[in-house]
């Protein structure tokens, strides 16, 4: 290669490298006493915001912090005995709120405007935070595609501690969630293609919930000392009106006998303590290799909401309430009051096989065997 060509090639390489470096997402470091929201507002899409240990309260009146930019990585640099805490203050209802800009103040957080238009925010992650004391949601995502919520602690958030809704391709892992007094610790609602693994939920009305969602993989989680360990269900008045293709495997549902403390005006106030897993109206769910231990009413329930509460299915309804094609296989039931509560109503194609003990104690109808 001639010196001219070599010089030209090096110049082009240098120009390309410089251009790439100039486009690299920025890293912003936030220290205790700094404004988290100011750092978010200053960040470019794709930026990483590293938050040093300390107690932060956020600047928002309703939402402590709000993120409407794509690709933001929020990293709590927690160290041993030095957490990164987002603490509720004043009139704040929600902790970390992530959504497209048009959906920061929806009339109903479960019916976000972005969901009606199939608009999405692409890319978000949060890790290493302790989010506590919010009367609404601890961590809320709506219409977010490609997200990660990993290694956080959410406690004392009264409605939902971690709540992705109308979102897709997400990973929720290694979170510790507790003290949600009105509803679910971790709630996957109207979502698609979500992995939920190795989380712990305790002291909530519902430990984990999958509602009106598809292709959710719930594995390796522990639901302990909740009113109900987990709920897989379908409800009306949602943008997504079906639920199917979900897998609940290798989880532990233990001692879910907590008294129900939900406000009387909440639907969740009707949940009777003592069931590890409630599958209500869902279709095509695989319940496999879970452990159900010391639940005071039943290890699990597979029911039609129309049987449990006929008023729930009073016409008109915009969903199919019958639980169909659910498989319950190779699970272990230990010292529950009953193993299975089975009232499928008009549901068809449900079956049980390979569970331990081989003969399960049942409340309701005889269990159909998988062929």
Where are the regions a protein language model picked out?
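Bacterial N-terminal signal peptides that target proteins for export
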Residues: 1-6
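Bacterial N-terminal signal peptides
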Residues: 7-16
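Right-handed parallel beta-helix/beta-spiral solenoid domain characteristic of secreted/periplasmic
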Residues: 24-34, 53-60, 64-66, 70-135
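Short glycine/acidic-rich loop motifs that flank beta-strands on beta-rich extracellular proteins
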Residues: 40, 60-63, 83, 89-94, ...
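Right-handed parallel beta-helix
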Residues: 52, 71-77, 119-133, 145-160, ...
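Intrinsically disordered, low-complexity Ser/Thr- and acidic-rich flexible linkers and loops
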Residues: 97-120, 186, 233-242, 259-272, ...
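Acidic, glycine- and Ser/Thr-rich low-complexity intrinsically disordered tracts
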Residues: 272, 308-371
């Amino acid at each position: 290669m001639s010196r001219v060509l070599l010089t030209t090639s090096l110049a082009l390489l240098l120009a390309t490298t410089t251009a790439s470096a100039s486009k690299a997402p920025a890293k912003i470091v936030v220290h205790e006493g700094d404004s988290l929201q100011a750092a978010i507002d200053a960040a470019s899409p794709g930026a990483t915001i590293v938050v040093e240990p300390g107690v932060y309260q956020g600047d928002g009146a309703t939402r402590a912090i709000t993120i409407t930019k794509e690709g933001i990585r929020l990293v709590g640099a927690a160290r041993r005995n030095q957490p990164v805490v987002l603490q509720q203050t004043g009139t704040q209802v929600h902790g970390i709120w992530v959504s497209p800009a048009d959906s920061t103040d929806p009339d109903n957080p479960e019916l976000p405007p972005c969901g009606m238009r199939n608009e999405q925010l692409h890319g978000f992650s949060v890790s290493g935070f302790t989010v506590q004391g919010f009367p609404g949601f601890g961590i809320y995502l709506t219409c977010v595609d490609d997200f990660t919520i990993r290694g956080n602690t959410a406690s004392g958030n009264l409605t939902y501690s971690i709540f992705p809704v109308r979102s897709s391709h997400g990973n929720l892992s290694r979170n510790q969630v507790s003290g949600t007094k009105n509803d679910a610790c971790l709630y996957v609602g109207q979502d698609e293609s979500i992995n939920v693994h190795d989380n712990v939920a305790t002291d909530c009305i519902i430990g984990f919930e999958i509602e009106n969602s598809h292709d959710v993989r719930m594995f390796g989680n522990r639901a302990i000392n909740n009113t109900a360990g987990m709920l897989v269900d379908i409800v009306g008045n949602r943008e997504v009106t079906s639920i199917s293709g979900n897998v609940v495997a290798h989880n532990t549902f233990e001692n879910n006998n907590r008294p129900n403390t939900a406000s009387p005006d909440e639907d969740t106030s009707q949940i009777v303590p003592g069931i590890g897993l409630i599958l209500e109206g869902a279709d095509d769910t695989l319940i496999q290799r879970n452990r159900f231990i010391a639940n005071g009413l039943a290890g699990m329930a597979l029911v039609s909401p129309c049987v449990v509460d006929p008023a729930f299915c009073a016409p008109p309804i915009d969903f199919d309430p019958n639980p169909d094609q659910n498989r319950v296989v190779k699970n272990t039931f230990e010292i529950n009051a009953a193993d299975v509560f089975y009232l499928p109503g008009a549901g068809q194609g449900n079956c049980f096989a390979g569970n331990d003990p081989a003969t399960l104690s049942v409340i309701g109808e005889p269990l159909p065997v998988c062929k």
